[in-house]
């Protein structure tokens, strides 16, 4: 199968961590024996003209490579670029929704109109969670719930002691970790407040953002800043509990990665995490209940460390398995077009 993959998030020289989850899926599709050509934006920022360039690149690739199917990641703008490419090549379009694309369409009439045009053109849609699929509302093509999964080799169990020695963090009581941008929607200040109420252990934030100053200088709190994606597993290995108590997470990739490394999690009950965080793997917390977060930290810290049950739950989302499921959707779209 010849696949043209179109995405607005892809690792590049400036931003090697951008869209790693899409890169991993493309890699596994190739391992399955499929040809995958990529038209992508590989850097953050820049002018909106980059989206027009993405569309032009996708159309040119479709004419040059003659794919069997176009696989776009994000409903818009990549979905729009993918739709144009699919029309030129006269092949089916499959589009995957990741979260921000759906929420953006719900907030903007212009984006909602553009997104409806993409979904009307698509032969099939893929959503990374059932919660997100429900947010799509009524759409014409079938929606398949398949997340991008986790690389079980990269996020494999490691001894905590070695990671703590390497990082110089995590030896004093339960070690809590948050990975992601320091934004209000991530509830990082609420997490720091809940940790202070708990009164023991250590808390590290891997990531940066506008709330950094509100977290700086707190007892027991370490601000590691942004680190390359390749270094994230060491931080997860050093922790006892990965915390992702956001207002909502359309999927919750960081929690899944921690579970794959046999670490328990505290995750938001809003969005995708309830679909893969089992009671044995972690604690779900209502983001509207501030007092519940301290209790959740204590409950998660009481789970086994390391936690084999967390790894077992994460293994259901092996990126190899998920890529094979996506390939089946693409193949069905091709077969339906030829019937």
Model segments located where?
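Nucleotide-activated donor-binding/catalytic signature segment of Leloir-type glycosyltransferases, i.e.
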Residues: 213-230
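Conserved donor-binding/catalytic core segment of Leloir-type glycosyltransferases
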Residues: 170-186, 192-196
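Aromatic "clamp/platform" in nucleotide-sugar-dependent glycosyltransferases that forms part
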Residues: 247
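Conserved acidic donor-binding segment of nucleotide-sugar-dependent glycosyltransferases
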Residues: 226, 278-279, 283-290, 299-304
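Carbohydrate-associated surface elements
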Residues: 131, 149
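A short helix/loop element that forms part of the nucleotide-sugar donor recognition site in Leloir-type
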Residues: 156-169, 307
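Short alpha-helical donor nucleotide-sugar binding micro-motif in glycosyltransferases
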Residues: 226-227, 234-239
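Short hydrophobic beta-strand element within catalytic cores of glycosyltransferases
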Residues: 264-267
């Amino acid at each position: 199968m010849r696949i043209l993959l179109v995405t607005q998030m892809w690792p590049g020289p400036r931003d090697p961590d951008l869209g790693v989850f899409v890169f991993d899926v493309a890699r596994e599709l190739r391992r399955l024996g499929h040809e995958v050509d990529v038209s992508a934006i590989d850097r953050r920022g820049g002018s909106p003209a980059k989206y027009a360039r993405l569309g032009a690149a996708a159309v040119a690739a479709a004419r040059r490579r003659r794919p069997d199917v176009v696989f776009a990641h994000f409903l818009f703008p990549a979905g729009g670029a993918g739709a144009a490419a699919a029309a030129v090549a006269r092949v089916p379009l499959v589009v995957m929704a990741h979260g921000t694309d759906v929420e953006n369409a719900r907030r903007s009439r212009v984006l909602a109109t553009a997104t409806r045009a993409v979904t009307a053109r698509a032969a099939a849609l893929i959503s990374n969670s059932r919660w997100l699929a429900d947010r799509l509302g009524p759409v014409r093509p079938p929606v398949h719930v398949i997340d991008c999964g986790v690389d079980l080799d990269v996020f494999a169990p490691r001894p905590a002691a070695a990671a703590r020695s390497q990082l110089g963090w995590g030896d004093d009581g339960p070690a809590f970790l948050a990975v992601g941008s320091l934004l209000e929607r991530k509830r990082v200040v609420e997490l720091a407040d809940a940790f202070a109420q708990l009164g023991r252990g250590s808390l590290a934030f891997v990531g940066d953002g506008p709330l950094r100053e509100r977290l700086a200088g707190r007892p027991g709190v370490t601000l590691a800043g942004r680190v390359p994606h390749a270094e994230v597993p060491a931080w997860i290995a050093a922790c006892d509990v990965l915390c992702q108590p956001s207002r909502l997470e359309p999927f919750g990739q960081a929690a899944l990665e921690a579970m794959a490394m046999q670490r328990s999690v505290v995750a938001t009950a809003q969005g995708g995490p309830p679909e893969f965080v089992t009671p044995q793997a972690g604690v779900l917390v209502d983001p509207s209940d501030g007092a519940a977060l301290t209790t959740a930290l204590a409950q998660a810290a009481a789970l086994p460390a390391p936690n084999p049950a967390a790894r077992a739950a994460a293994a259901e989302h092996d990126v190899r398995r998920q890529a094979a499921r996506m390939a089946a959707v693409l193949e069905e779209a091709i077969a339906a077009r030829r019937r």
